[in-house]
């Protein structure tokens, strides 16, 4: 039986302390905060002899403003709620490995010693086999720390499991901008960083069967195109998405194979469950879309040049741009617009858009220069 071992997680900073009780206490706190439990790589005596049929990776961004108040007026953090859901799911899956990364704000012990700003949890067959804390500023890319830990955690003996990746956080910028990570205000982040992270998680020869993008405005041609090389199916919202109400419960009974359209059927069920929860709990517009990546390729290719041009314009006039349904812009009125999409949409209960009954499933930028598209034959357009 492989012995569980303790390691001191990568501490890259050194400190000096005065002799005395305060220094000893500070040092003890530092090492207590840095100690981690790593999983035995493939210890059957510990984890049992079950087969890993599903592999789930969660990245939950909590390094920002995720405070909200529930219907009872209680203050809560959306990222902590999603973390609790993910951990509960992990404990219920006997044939899965689940890796959860929680990116948190950097804090200090005794106002001096920086604490790790990332937490990782590894479950296999419903058991928590490992957890560790880590620094999020290590590595040559935004998600390199998570990818490196995943490589250490993952079950190397599993053969072709159904693979899912779920990201929860604020809207991922389409251009490199500062301010996404509160602890790293000067660091530039874009959806391209997530795409690069996915490429590291999947390796050169594989894709995630399902990617869930739990952010606002994730259903844009640019975002789906960036993630497309690493995913077969994507669930995203082209509009606002209330993270605190996103329901993970369908994952608790996950029991599917890659064949016979099972992943697609599960994606539809997962999206419908999230949509039903959102429409029950919020009054604003709700949109959840399932994208069959291969089937959307023709539309993405047809609009890429126009979208990139508009994106560049939007970058130069941030005060005057807003999101809009791509169907409102004639430049995107292509016959392939609806291909590969399952669109779930409900208009807001109030405001000028309360009578809208349809959404194309694609979100674009309005620079104030476009007119509503007159294309009634396009199935993706609003009526």
Role assignments for model-derived ranges:
Residues 1-18:
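N-terminal secretory signal peptides that target proteins for export/translocation
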Residues 13-15, 29, 297:
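Short non-domain terminal segments
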Residues 41-80, 84-103, 109-383:
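Terminal, contiguous helix-loop blocks that mediate binding/assembly
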Residues 32-33:
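C-terminal motif of bacterial Sec signal peptides marking the signal peptidase cleavage site
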Residues 19-27:
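Sec-dependent N-terminal signal peptides
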């Amino acid at each position: 039986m492989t012995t569980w071992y303790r390691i001191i997680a990568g501490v890259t900073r050194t400190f000096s302390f005065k002799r005395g009780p305060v220094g000893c206490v500070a040092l003890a706190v530092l090492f207590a905060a840095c100690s981690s439990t790593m999983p035995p790589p493939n210890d059957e005596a510990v984890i049992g002899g079950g087969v890993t049929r599903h592999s789930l990776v969660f990245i939950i961004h909590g390094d920002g403003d995720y405070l909200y108040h529930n219907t009872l007026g209680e203050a809560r953090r959306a990222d902590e709620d999603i973390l609790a859901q993910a951990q509960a799911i992990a404990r219920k899956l006997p044939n899965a490995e689940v890796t959860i990364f929680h990116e948190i704000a950097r804090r200090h012990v005794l106002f001096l010693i920086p604490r790790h700003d990332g937490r990782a949890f590894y479950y296999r067959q419903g058991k928590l086999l490992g957890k560790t804390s880590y620094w999020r500023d290590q590595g040559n890319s935004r998600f390199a720390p998570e990818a490196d830990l995943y490589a250490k955690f993952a079950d190397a003996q599993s053969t072709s499991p159904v693979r899912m990746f779920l990201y929860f956080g604020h809207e991922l910028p389409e251009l490199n901008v500062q301010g996404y990570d509160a602890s790293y205000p000067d660091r530039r982040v874009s959806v391209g960083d997530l795409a690069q992270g996915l490429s590291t998680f999947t390796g050169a020869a594989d894709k995630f069967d399902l990617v869930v993008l739990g952010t606002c405005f994730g259903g844009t041609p640019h975002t789906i195109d960036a993630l497309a090389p690493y995913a077969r199916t994507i669930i995203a919202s082209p509009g606002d998405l209330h993270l605190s109400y996103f329901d993970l419960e369908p994952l608790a009974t996950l029991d599917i194979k890659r064949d016979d359209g099972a992943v697609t059927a599960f994606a539809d069920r997962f999206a419908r469950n999230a949509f039903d929860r959102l429409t029950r709990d919020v009054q604003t517009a709700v949109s959840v879309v399932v994208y069959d990546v291969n089937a959307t390729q023709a539309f993405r290719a047809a609009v890429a040049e126009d979208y990139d041009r508009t994106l560049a314009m939007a970058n130069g006039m941030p005060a005057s741009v807003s999101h809009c349904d791509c169907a409102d812009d004639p430049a995107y009125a292509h016959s392939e617009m609806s291909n590969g999409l399952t669109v779930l949409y409900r208009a807001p209960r109030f405001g000028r858009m309360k009578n809208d009954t349809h959404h194309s499933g694609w979100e674009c930028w309005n620079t104030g220069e476009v007119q509503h598209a007159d294309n009634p034959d396009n199935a993706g357009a609003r009526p």
